[in-house]
Amino acid sequence: MLDKLENTFHFQQEALSLRNKRQEILAANIANADTPGFQARDIDFAAELKKTMENGRTGSHGLQLTMTSERHIPIKPGYRLEADLLYRVPHQTSMDGNTVDMDMERSNFADNSVKYQADVTFINSQVKSMMAVLQQG
């Protein structure tokens, strides 16, 4: 019984963590939309969640984010990401080499935000259900 609860919450915790990391990556893409040569990045959420659930977290062996220009806005100083960062293939590259498509980034940012909120709502409803069962005895 407790294993099922632990697995359910572990899955939700990992999903929230990955959604949070993706949100930071998308925010960095948006922040660097006017930076010449900036390459838009993202993660494959489904593949990363599957990998995390099968193998567990990689801990300190994660991918270290680096800036290729001093004008890039960092995601976070010393930020370590366990997910594999992918470079987004642009539909049309700008003349300065920047691959950020603001329409796509805003759409992905909003979609990820809605899914994050849905995950939080789902977890809250699970906790409330368990609390109701425990209170009723």
Swiss-Prot record:
One Pfam family, short name: Flg_bb_rod
GO cellular component terms, semicolon-separated: bacterial-type flagellum basal body, rod
Location(s) in or outside the cell: Bacterial flagellum basal body
Keywords from the UniProt entry: Bacterial flagellum
The keyword Manganese is assigned to this record: no
Domain of life: Bacteria
GO process terms (BP): bacterial-type flagellum-dependent cell motility
Keyword Cytoplasm among UniProt keywords: no
Main location: other
InterPro entries linked to this entry: Flag_bb_rod_N, Flagellar_basal_body_rod_CS, FlgB
Family (UniProt): Belongs to the flagella basal body rod proteins family.
Function: Structural component of flagellum, the bacterial motility apparatus. Part of the rod structure of flagellar basal body.
Subunit record text: The basal body constitutes a major portion of the flagellar organelle and consists of a number of rings mounted on a central rod. In Gram-negative bacteria, at least four rings, L, P, S and M are present, whereas Gram-positive bacteria lack the L and P rings. The rod consists of about 26 subunits of FlgG in the distal portion, and FlgB, FlgC and FlgF build up the proximal portion of the rod with about 6 subunits each.
Name of the protein in question: Flagellar basal body rod protein FlgB
Species name: Proteus mirabilis (strain HI4320)
